Amino acid sequence: MQLKIQLLMLVLMIVLTDVYSKDGFIVSKKNCLYRCSQSDERGFCNAVCLRYDADSGYCRTGKCWCDGLPQKANIAMKNKNYC
């Protein structure tokens, strides 16, 4: 019984974490995208994304992409211009 409860709690945590997080190009407080180099291999972007409480980050199409951001994080919208 104890194992079933622990397993249920684990599944709920995974589901809720996925529901309450989002992915995207992070936007700074100055409304700018973080630019990066494809050769960066997680260094710069991962550090930027972690500052915004994301799970991880990497360079994607010359901009920092973050995985697992909190819902309050500001991410880029498709038809909007950023500095």
Swiss-Prot record:
Annotated protein name in UniProt = Neurotoxin LmNaTx3
Q: Does the keyword Cell division apply?
A: no
Q: Name one GO molecular function term.
A: sodium channel inhibitor activity
Q: For this UniProt entry, what is the primary localization, expressed as one broad class?
A: secreted
**Which residues constitute the signal peptide according to the record?**
1-21
User: How would you summarize where this protein is expressed among tissues?
Assistant: Expressed by the venom gland.
- Any Pfam family from its record, for instance, is Toxin_3
Q: Mind giving the lineage of the organism this protein is from? A: Eukaryota, Metazoa, Ecdysozoa, Arthropoda, Chelicerata
Q: Which organism is it from?
A: Lychas mucronatus
Q: Where does the source fall among the domains of life?
A: Eukaryota
